[in-house]
C-alpha cells in the first residue's frame, strides 16, 4: 500500500509507475484505488467499477459507519482481485482533506493485511518526520509492514496551499514552459534513491521527479474549467499558453478575443462571447481574456482516472526511476508466511459466505426490538432469510417503532398456528423419557422449543436465540432434540475475538465447566476446524500459567495431556502446549520461552483449561482492549443453534445469524 505522508499529491503517478515496474519484472500487477474523485473535469463521475467516490466515503464517516466503509472497500478489492487474477496489487492510499486520511489509510491497510510503502514529497531528511507521523496510526506493528519508500515531486510548482499546480506560460527546452519545474527532458537515473545525510529509516525504491507532460490537459478538461462550449477534438492536449496567434505552437493553447486568421495552436480559447472555428479545438466563453488567464494560473496538476492515455504514459515515465533489484524483490517480500485475518476482512467473509449459503434462520424472539432490527438488516443484505416467530402485526408494530422496514426477504410464523403439528414428533423423540402429549404441548409453548422442532424437521436451517432467554433455555431443547453431531462427544462454545489486526478464536468460554483432557482435546479440534471453516489459519495454543516444562501443577499436567491427545487424534493440525498467553501471541516472548514451537508467537486459536479461565479472559480482553466478540458459537451439535448474550447489540445478532447460516451451509457438504 502506498501510504501518503502529508499531502503526497503525486500518488497516482507513483502507483502507476510501481505497477509498470512490477510488470516489467514479470509480475501480474494491478492498482487498486479505494476512493476516487467524485467528478472528473467534465463533471461526470470518474470512479472505476472498483472505487468508491470520496463523496460517498465522507457520508459513511459522517454517519459513524467507518466499519461499513472499510467492508465496502474490501468488497471492491475482492472483486478486483477476482476479475484481474493479479498476484500483486498496489493499493493507492487516500489523500483527503475532508476526513482523517491517516486513520482511514491505517484501517484499510490493516483490513487488507497490506505491506506499506510511505510516499513523501521533498528531500529524504524532511520525509523522516512525515513518515513517523503517518506510521503513528499503525502502532507497534507498523514498522514491520514497511518494505520501502518513495520520494516524489520535490521540484513541482505549488500554489499557496501547497497543492501542485500546472503552470502554462512561456516556453522551455522541454517543450513545455520555463517555470514548470519540469524534469521531463532529463535522462532518468534508474534506481535513484535517498541521498540525505544520515541513515534513512526506509529503503527508497524510487525518487520520482516532476514532469509537467504527465499532467498535459485535454481540451475537454480546459472547457470544463472555463465553463465554455467546446467544438472539435476534445482529446487534443496542451502544456503551454500563448496570447499571440502568429507565434503559438502546436502544443499550446491560444487565448484571444478575436478569431485568428491562422494559428498552429492546438486549442483556441475565444473570449468575450466571440464565436467561430479556429484550431484543432475551439472553446468559446463569455469570460474576458484576463479572467481566462486568471483561471489558467489556478489549474491543478492532476490526472483523472478516466484519462487512460495520461495514466499509461505517467506510469511509464515513473517506472524508469524505480530501483529494478528492489522492485524485483517486492513480490517475494510481500508474500506472507502467516497472513492475518483482520476484523474487517472477517466480517466481509462472514457476509459473503452467509449469502452463498442462502439459509432460513429461525429467530424465536421475533418481537424483541433488537432482533427485529437485526432481521431487517439480515434481509436487506441477503445474509439469510430471517424467520420471525410471533404475531405478524405485533412484529410490524415493533419494526415501525424502531424505524426499520420488514419487507421482502423476511418470513413470519405465528406459533399458535403450528404448535399442534409438532406434538406427535416431540412425543416420539422423548418417549424414552416418558413425555406425554400434554407435556409436549406445554414445552411447545416456548418458541425456542418450537423453533428447535422446526429445525429438527429441516423446515429451517439454523436457530439463534438468547436476547431475552438464558443460555440454558436456548441450548437445552437442542441437546434434547437435535443431539450432538456424529463423532462429537460434547458440545462446546467459542468466541471470535476481533482484535485490531487479527481475529482469534477463544474456547471454551461458555459451556464446559471443568473439561478433562479428552474433552479439552475435542474442544481444541472442534475449534481448529471452526477457525479453518471461517478462513482463519488454525494454530492452536493450549493455554495455562506455564510454558512447556517451566512450571508444575494440575492445570499444567491437564493441558500437557490434552495437547498430546489432540495431536494424536489430528496430526494434520498445528497444536502446541502448554503455553502462556503472552508466549502464544508475542514473537519476542515466544523466542525466549518456546523457540522451537510452531504455534508460539503466532497462535490464532486459544483453548483454556476451564470455563472460569476462558470466560474471564474473554471478558477481560473484550472490555479492556475494546474488542468486538462474536459468539458464543456452539460446536458439536447436529444442526446449528447459537446463543446470544442478553446484552447483545444489533450487530452481534446480525453476525451470529451469519455464522449460523454458514454452519448450516457447511453441514450440507
Go through the PLM ranges and name each one:
Residues 337-600, 605-669:
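Anion-binding alpha/beta catalytic cores of soluble intermediary-metabolism enzymes, centered on
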Residues 1-282, 286-335:
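Flexible phosphate-sensing "switch/lid" loops adjacent to ATP/NTP-binding sites
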Amino acid at each position: 500500500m502506498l501510504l501518503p505522508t502529508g499531502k503526497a499529491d503525486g500518488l497516482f503517478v507513483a502507483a502507476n509507475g510501481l505497477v509498470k515496474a512490477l510488470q516489467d519484472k514479470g509480475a501480474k500487477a494491478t492498482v487498486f484505488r479505494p476512493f476516487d474523485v467524485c467528478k472528473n473535469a467534465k463533471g461526470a463521475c470518474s470512479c472505476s467499477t472498483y472505487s468508491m467516490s470520496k463523496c460517498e466515503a465522507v457520508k459513511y464517516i459522517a454517519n459513524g459507519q467507518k466499519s461499513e466503509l472499510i467492508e465496502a472497500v474490501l468488497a471492491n478489492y475482492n472483486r478486483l482481485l477476482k476479475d484481474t487474477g493479479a498476484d500483486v496489487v498496489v493499493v493507492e492510499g487516500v489523500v483527503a482533506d475532508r476526513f482523517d486520511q491517516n486513520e482511514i489509510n491505517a484501517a484499510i491497510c490493516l483490513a487488507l493485511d497490506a505491506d506499506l510503502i510511505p510516499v513523501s514529497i521533498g528531500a529524504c531528511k524532511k520525509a523522516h518526520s512525515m513518515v513517523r507521523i503517518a506510521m503513528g496510526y499503525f502502532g507497534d506493528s507498523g514498522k514491520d509492514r514497511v518494505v520501502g519508500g518513495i520520494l516524489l515531486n520535490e521540484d513541482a510548482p505549488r500554489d499557496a496551499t501547497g497543492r501542485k499546480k500546472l503552470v502554462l506560460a512561456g516556453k522551455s527546452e522541454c517543450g513545455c514552459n520555463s517555470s514548470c519545474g519540469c524534469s521531463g527532458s532529463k535522462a532518468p537515473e534508474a534506481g535513484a534513491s535517498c541521498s540525505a545525510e544520515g541513515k534513512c529509516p526506509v529503503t527508497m525504491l524510487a525518487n520520482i521527479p516532476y514532469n509537467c507532460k504527465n499532467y498535459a490537459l485535454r481540451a475537454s478538461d480546459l472547457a470544463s474549467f472555463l465553463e465554455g462550449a467546446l467544438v472539435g477534438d476534445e482529446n487534443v492536449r496542451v502544456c503551454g499558453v500563448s496570447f499571440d496567434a502568429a507565434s503559438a505552437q502546436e502544443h499550446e493553447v491560444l487565448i484571444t478575443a478575436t478569431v485568428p486568421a491562422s494559428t498552429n495552436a492546438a486549442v483556441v480559447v475565444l473570449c468575450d462571447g466571440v464565436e467561430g472555428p479556429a484550431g484543432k479545438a475551439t472553446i468559446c466563453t463569455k469570460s474576458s481574456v484576463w479572467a481566462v488567464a486568471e483561471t489558467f494560473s489556478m489549474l491543478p496538476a492532476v490526472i483523472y482516472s478516466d484519462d487512460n492515455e495520461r495514466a499509461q504514459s505517467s506510469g511509464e515515465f515513473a517506472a524508469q526511476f524505480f530501483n529494478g533489484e528492489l522492485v524485483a524483490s517486492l513480490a517475494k517480500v510481500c508474500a506472507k508466511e502467516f497472513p492475518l485475518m483482520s476484523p474487517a476482512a472477517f466480517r466481509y467473509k462472514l457476509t459473503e459466505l452467509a449469502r452463498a449459503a442462502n439459509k432460513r434462520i429461525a429467530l424465536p424472539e421475533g418481537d424483541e426490538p433488537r432482533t427485529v432490527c437485526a432481521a431487517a438488516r439480515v434481509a436487506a443484505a441477503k445474509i439469510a432469510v430471517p424467520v420471525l416467530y410471533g404475531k405478524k402485526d405485533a412484529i410490524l408494530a415493533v419494526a415501525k417503532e424502531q424505524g426499520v422496514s420488514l419487507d421482502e426477504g423476511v418470513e413470519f410464523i405465528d406459533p399458535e398456528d403450528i404448535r399442534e403439528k409438532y406434538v406427535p414428533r416431540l412425543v416420539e423423540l422423548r418417549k424414552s423419557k416418558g413425555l406425554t402429549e400434554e407435556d409436549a404441548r406445554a414445552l411447545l409453548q416456548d418458541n425456542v422449543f418450537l423453533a428447535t422442532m422446526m429445525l429438527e424437521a429441516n423446515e429451517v436451517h439454523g436457530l439463534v436465540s438468547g436476547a431475552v432467554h438464558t443460555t440454558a433455555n436456548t441450548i437445552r431443547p437442542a441437546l434434547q432434540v437435535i443431539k450432538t453431531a456424529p463423532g462429537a462427544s460434547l458440545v462446546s462454545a467459542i468466541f471470535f475475538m476481533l482484535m485490531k489486526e487479527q481475529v482469534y478464536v477463544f474456547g471454551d468460554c461458555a459451556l464446559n465447566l471443568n473439561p478433562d483432557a479428552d474433552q479439552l482435546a475435542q474442544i481444541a479440534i472442534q475449534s481448529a476446524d471452526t477457525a479453518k471453516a471461517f478462513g482463519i489459519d488454525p494454530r492452536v495454543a493450549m493455554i495455562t500459567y506455564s510454558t512447556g516444562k517451566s512450571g508444575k501443577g494440575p492445570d499444567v499436567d491437564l493441558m500437557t495431556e490434552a495437547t498430546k491427545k489432540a495431536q494424536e487424534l489430528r496430526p494434520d493440525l498445528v497444536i502446541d502446549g502448554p503455553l502462556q498467553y503472552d508466549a502464544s501471541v508475542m514473537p519476542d516472548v515466544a523466542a525466549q520461552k518456546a523457540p522451537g514451537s510452531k504455534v508460539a508467537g503466532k497462535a490464532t486459536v486459544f483453548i483454556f483449561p476451564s470455563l472460569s479461565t476462558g470466560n474471564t479472559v474473554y471478558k477481560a480482553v473484550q472490555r479492556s482492549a475494546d474488542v468486538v466478540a462474536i459468539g458464543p458459537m456452539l460446536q458439536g451439535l447436529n444442526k446449528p443453534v447459537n446463543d446470544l448474550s442478553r446484552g447483545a447489540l444489533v450487530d452481534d445478532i446480525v453476525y451470529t445469524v451469519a455464522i449460523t447460516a454458514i454452519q448450516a451451509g457447511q453441514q450440507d457438504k
